[in-house]
Amino acid sequence: MMNRIHAVILDWAGTTVDFGSFAPTQIFVEAFRQAFDVEITLAEARVPMGLGKWQHIEALGKLPAVDARWQAKFGRSMSAADIDAIYAAFMPLQIAKVVDFSSPIAGVIDTIAALRAEGIKIGSCSGYPRAVMERLVPAAAEHGYRPDHWVATDDLAAGGRPGPWMALQNVIALGIDAVAHCVKVDDAAPGISEGLNAGMWTVGLAVSGNEFGATWDAYQTMSKEDVAVRREHAASKLYAAGAHYVVDSLADLSGVIAHINARLAQGERP
């Protein structure tokens, strides 16, 4: 039992709940509008996904197109005080909205059950702050998704992604003996970096999450050609971030775990 996976550490939006990661993206658009009457697009809102939300807003302000709009309106770039104001608008909107995006993505419940049947523990972490997670976690539990542990982006003094700290806090809480026996699963590049920085195997999700950027209903009616183009776009970003594997969704994870177990048995490490 030594050379096998003992824990998976899962992201939330776009990985286990909220197909397409729509809860945070729509709220960023609304928060910019509410705080400063500045328009950003959904596509722009998606670019820094995976970071903590204050850092996400900061990164949005540095996007050339957003900075140009800000300069045109205010004659300067976005300041820390501006970020605070947008974050203050973001938080109540996100807390109110997140429960509406708490249903597990197709295949998640069955995959978790299969992993637990193999003795694998289920950790989790998120770019959401604790105030949002305290609404999301019980809502997801009502739908049947209950990880063994969760960490919010503002829980740790060291910080959040792309640093390793949230993933490593899961290792401590779950009592896992080696980071090489852990898999970090995420739909965005900062979460892949988090897993790599923590010394873990990493699996990117190309269809269920932020980079693919479609609702479940839109995905169901999409042409094979459109799916292939979007999948390739998402997979290329996740592989560029260093993902060891990229699959469509969490429903495909069990086969990856078996492959990693075979590599561990041969003495390989992440």
Curated annotation (Swiss-Prot):
- Which InterPro entries does the entry mention? HAD-like_hydrolase_sf, HAD-like_sf, HAD-SF_hydro_IA, HAD_sf, PGP-like_dom2, Phosphonoacetald_hydro
Citing just one GO molecular function, the answer is: phosphoglycolate phosphatase activity
Q: Which residues bind Mg(2+)?
A: D11, A13, D187
Q: Which residues form the active site?
A: D11, K53
Q: Which GO terms describe its cellular component?
A: cytosol
Under SUPFAM superfamilies, the record lists: HAD-like
First-level EC class: hydrolase
Q: Which domain of life is it from?
A: Bacteria
Keyword list (alphabetical) reads:
Hydrolase, Magnesium, Metal-binding, Schiff base
* Annotated EC: 3.11.1.1
Question: What note does UniProt attach to the cofactor annotation?
Answer: Binds 1 Mg(2+) ion per subunit.
Q: Which GO terms describe its biological process?
A: DNA repair; organic phosphonate catabolic process
Q: Name one Pfam family in it.
A: Hydrolase
Q: Which reaction does it catalyse?
A: phosphonoacetaldehyde + H2O = acetaldehyde + phosphate + H(+)
Q: Which cofactor does it need?
A: Mg(2+)
Job of this protein: Involved in phosphonate degradation.
Q: How does it assemble?
A: Homodimer.
Q: Which family, according to UniProt?
A: Belongs to the HAD-like hydrolase superfamily. PhnX family.
Q: What is this protein called?
A: Phosphonoacetaldehyde hydrolase
Its taxonomic placement starts with:
Bacteria, Pseudomonadati, Pseudomonadota, Gammaproteobacteria, Enterobacterales
- Its gene is phnX
